[in-house]
């Protein structure tokens, strides 16, 4: 147990942020402090954990209390937000315009001119601020051969059971992805929506326990350049506090929704202790069709993106490593990443986005020191040796079955509604309307009882629902 020197809790009248010195010419960054005592959370690590990792079937669904209404821009009149607002040096916040969203979803103004005086990413993809006192954004893995793993919009909360498709979606809500990463000794930078942390804090604790890096993705997921200065402060503050309350750590990293950022937003975030993290490759996975979330991008298009990056790396065409935008948004996005990660690992070294940029202390709590990336292209998997007893039965699916989209694996089935798409490894598009694209597949099912006997490092391939298809 520890008490971070950078997190001092005192009354609301006290200074809301404590300045730290810098030697690189950047505006002094500050470590957040909070106006009332935050209880130390239980069931969470207080320093980096390199394994073995916790694999769980269920998580506590108790929500945090004392936070703003979820998915709404928080009030700017609360005493906590005002205290943070008053701590910022507004002379160092550029006067970029507060933009509006038009009926077609575009921004107004959509550009600040060809000289781009405010480094407006949504217009020019600018990643180096036009003011010298702010650092450049992190947007790539500098070293060739690295894949910076990131997921936005988590933690993926379970869907209410009275919703259509809830049972199918909830198979892939957390802890599904975090279990998968933990089993395979993989780590990601997770950009959390504060509202999702507030409603599912146990998922954030599991992610931290399993060696992932937690970052901020705002409270309500609104484009940041469309918000007032005070609204930006409120969005970031409550997200930081939610993560701190749930896990005990205070992030130094954040990502703006849609990448929408300019130097006005960057300066406010930097003065609140956060550095901007973007990307140089985008899967567009959020736009895949899902019964609950809409979307129109064929999953095969997303497959092509992954394969294109792999081919480019194999051909020596990539000048740097890549930092890739993915989401833990629904069963489609979670299945997509589970399908591709084993393939990606054959070509790239997969690490968190912050790790590939040499950041070993991503929180203001200095007891958390993450490993230095060693520059090699090897991967390590920890697995468990078990004794198993099996009973095998063979069943044949009926003709013209239905299926549910969202899983992978040539000719396999995960027990939803039958076995179809047996000629493909990806049946998302064909199954999206619940119909198979061809004759059914005969399926052999195996019931397995397992007793753990010993644990060692080995290389195994476990076929479970993470890798099966609705095929």
Residue spans for each PLM region:
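Low-complexity, Gly/Ser/Thr/Pro-rich intrinsically disordered linker/tail segments
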Residues: 320, 346-393
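Catalytic domains of cell-wall/extracellular-matrix polysaccharide-remodeling enzymes
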Residues: 198-202, 219-364
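Cleaved targeting-peptide boundary
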Residues: 19-28, 403
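Secreted, short cysteine-rich peptides and small extracellular cysteine-rich domains stabilized by multiple disulfide
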Residues: 118, 122-125, 401-441, 465-471
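Active-site beta->alpha N-cap acidic-glycine motif
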Residues: 60, 64-223, 231, 235-252
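N-linked glycosylation sites
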Residues: 20-22, 42, 335, 400
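Fungal secretory targeting signals
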Residues: 1-20, 464-471
């Amino acid at each position: 147990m520890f008490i971070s020197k950078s997190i001092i809790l005192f009354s609301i009248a006290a200074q809301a942020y404590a300045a730290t010195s810098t030697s690189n010419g950047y505006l002094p960054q500050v470590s957040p402090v909070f106006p009332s005592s935050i209880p130390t959370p239980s069931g969470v690590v207080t320093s980096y954990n390199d394994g073995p990792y916790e694999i769980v079937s269920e998580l506590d669904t108790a929500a945090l209390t004392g936070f703003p209404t979820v998915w709404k821009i928080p009030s700017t009149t609360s005493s906590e937000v005002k205290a943070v607002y008053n701590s910022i040096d507004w002379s160092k916040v550029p006067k970029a315009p507060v933009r509006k969203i038009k009926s077609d979803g575009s921004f107004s103004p959509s550009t600040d001119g060809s000289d781009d005086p405010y480094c407006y990413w949504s217009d020019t993809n600018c990643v180096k601020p036009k003011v010298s006192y702010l650092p450049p954004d992190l947007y790539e893995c500098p070293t060739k051969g690295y894949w910076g793993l990131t997921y936005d919009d988590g933690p993926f909360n379970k869907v209410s059971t009275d919703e259509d498709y809830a049972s199918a979606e909830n198979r892939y809500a957390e802890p599904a992805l975090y279990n998968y990463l933990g089993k395979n000794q993989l780590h990601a930078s997770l950009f959390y929506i504060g509202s999702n942390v507030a409603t599912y804090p146990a998922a954030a604790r599991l992610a931290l326990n399993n060696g992932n890096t937690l970052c901020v993705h705002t409270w309500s997921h609104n484009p940041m350049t469309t918000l007032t200065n005070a609204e930006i402060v409120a969005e970031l503050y409550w997200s930081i506090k939610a993560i701190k309350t749930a896990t005990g750590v205070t992030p130094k990293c954040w990502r703006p929704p849609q990448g929408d950022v300019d130097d006005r937003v960057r300066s406010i975030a930097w003065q609140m202790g956060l550095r901007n993290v973007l990307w140089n490759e985008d899967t567009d996975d959020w736009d895949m069709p899902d019964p609950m979330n809409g979307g129109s991008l064929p999953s095969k298009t997303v497959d092509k993106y992954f394969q294109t990056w792999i081919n480019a790396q194999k051909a020596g065409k990539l000048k740097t490593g890549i930092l890739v935008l993915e989401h833990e948004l629904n069963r489609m996005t979670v299945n997509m990443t589970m399908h591709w990660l084993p393939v990606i690992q054959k070509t790239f070294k997969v690490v968190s986005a912050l790790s590939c940029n040499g950041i070993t202390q991503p929180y203001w709590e200095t007891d958390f020191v993450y490993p230095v990336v060693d520059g090699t292209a090897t991967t390590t998997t920890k697995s468990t040796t078990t004794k198993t007893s099996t009973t095998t039965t063979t069943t044949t699916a009926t003709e013209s079955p239905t299926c549910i989209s969202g899983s992978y694996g040539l000719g396999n089935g995960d027990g939803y509604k039958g076995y179809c798409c047996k000629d493909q490894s990806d049946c998302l598009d064909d199954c999206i309307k619940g119909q198979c694209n061809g004759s059914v597949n005969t399926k052999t099912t195996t019931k397995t009882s397992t007793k753990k006997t010993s644990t060692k490092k080995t290389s195994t391939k476990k076929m479970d629902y993470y890798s099966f298809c609705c095929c």
